[in-house]
Every structure is written in structure tokens, then in C-alpha cells.
């Protein structure tokens, strides 16, 4: 069996986004817009951090899955493909994190 990837999840989200399926959480999030999706992303980020601090391995796995899903929803609503994020990450791999951060525009 092939491994499930972020790209697979991105495709599922794209397919369900405008499906009109009343049972689809993805369709509901897209219908509610970026404000609701961003709120959910923030909530999941906090829950992920809490699970990590508590040392709750299963909670961290579960909340991380929620976080990644909601992050991809926000990207989709914003019209930013995952490939753009991956290209940005790739461009940073040849530099130290400190040098990369220093090279970012101020503001």
C-alpha cells in the first residue's frame, strides 16, 4: 500500500470543498469562509501544543492530524497550493535557519 501524503489530503480537500455534501466538514468550512477556517486552525494549533507539553503522545498524533487538515483547508481557501509551501521550504534548506530568518524582509 502506498503511503498517504499531504498531496493526497490536499486533493481530497479540493474535491470536497464545493461538493455541497451536507455531511462534509470540508464543504461546511469552505462555505463558512476563511475566518472560520483560520479560527479552527488556531484552535488546533493550541490543542497540538498542549498535547505536546503534556507528553500526550496519542493526543499529539490526533491533534497534529487535525492541525494539518485545517492548515490545508486554509491554504485552499487562500488559493495557495501546497506546492508553493514546499518550494519555499526547499529554498530554505541550503541556509541555516538563523541566516534564512535574517534574510526575510522586515515589516
Curated annotation (Swiss-Prot):
Subcellular location(s) per record: Cytoplasm
Pfam families: PRA-PH
UniProt GO BP: L-histidine biosynthetic process
Top EC group: hydrolase
Keywords assigned: Amino-acid biosynthesis, ATP-binding, Cytoplasm, Histidine biosynthesis, Hydrolase, Nucleotide-binding
Family statement drawn from the similarity comment of this UniProt entry: Belongs to the PRA-PH family.
Organism: Mesorhizobium japonicum (strain LMG 29417 / CECT 9101 / MAFF 303099)
A GO molecular-function annotation: phosphoribosyl-ATP diphosphatase activity
Protein name, entry field: Phosphoribosyl-ATP pyrophosphatase
Cellular component GO terms held in the UniProt record: cytoplasm
Metabolic or biological pathway, per its Swiss-Prot or TrEMBL entry: Amino-acid biosynthesis; L-histidine biosynthesis; L-histidine from 5-phospho-alpha-D-ribose 1-diphosphate: step 2/9
Lineage, uppermost ranks: Bacteria, Pseudomonadati, Pseudomonadota, Alphaproteobacteria, Hyphomicrobiales
Database matches in PANTHER family: HISTIDINE BIOSYNTHESIS BIFUNCTIONAL PROTEIN (PTHR42945), HISTIDINE BIOSYNTHESIS BIFUNCTIONAL PROTEIN HIS7 (PTHR42945:SF1)
Chief localization: cytoplasm
Catalytic activities: 1-(5-phospho-beta-D-ribosyl)-ATP + H2O = 1-(5-phospho-beta-D-ribosyl)-5'-AMP + diphosphate + H(+)
E.C. no: 3.6.1.31
